[in-house]
Amino acid sequence: MSTMIMDLCSYTRLGLTGYLTSRGIKKQEIVEVNSAADLQKHCTSCCPAVVFLNEDCFVHDDESNGIIRQIITQNPATLFVIFMSLANIHFDRYLRVRKNLLISSKSITPKDLDVILVNYLKYKNTSVGQLTLPTLSLSKTESNMLQMWMAGHGTSQISTQMNIKAKTVSSHKGNIKKKIQTHNKQVIYHIVRLTENITSGIQVNMR
């Protein structure tokens, strides 16, 4: 299972390498890359099964951000796991936001990785189509409400502008928190912005 790691933190790189080798992946199948351009070059030449990358490696640079977005689109058979940079906030979950893209906390455990990579580790060359994790999606109403919420509108403002009851707004907020698996507004905003950076945003169910 060819794997690439792009992370500035040596502890994370060592931890991931140790985890992968303990699960039977050979060291020569694990490649460390230092930049988005370097990752693009490697993905073009060998099409890795899994890529782990830290958002800090690209999110602050428009060019790197664009390259990562392009890489994810051009490699639909590769699973990309992006670690969020969240300072002093407890969040230990992971979310599938596209068929081949997961956004994860750095607090992810080996047990969590076993769940995510079970088919990869078992078959070594499986495709993302065999991932059993559900893909995060919001209803059109939830999506519209979330944008207003992120723009700083309170429940009463959202209620008035969307012409719905305040308790319905609260219910939608509860659904969003449940789907994103956190009650922390800062984490929700972070996940939404990161998803928008590298995709067209959280998927919206138009039905």
UniProtKB/Swiss-Prot annotation:
Record SMART domains: HTH_LUXR (SM00421)
GO biological process annotation, one example: regulation of DNA-templated transcription
Domain HTH luxR-type: from-to ranges: 131-196
Superkingdom of this protein's organism: Bacteria
Gene3D superfamilies assigned: Winged helix-like DNA-binding domain superfamily/Winged helix DNA-binding domain
Annotated DNA-binding residue span(s): 155-174
InterPro entries per UniProt: RcsA (IPR030866), Sig_transdc_resp-reg_C-effctor (IPR016032), Tscrpt_reg_LuxR_C (IPR000792), WH-like_DNA-bd_sf (IPR036388)
GO molecular function: DNA binding
NCBIfam families: PRK15411.1
Protein name, UniProt field: Transcriptional regulatory protein RcsA
Protein source organism: Klebsiella aerogenes
Gene encoding the protein: rcsA
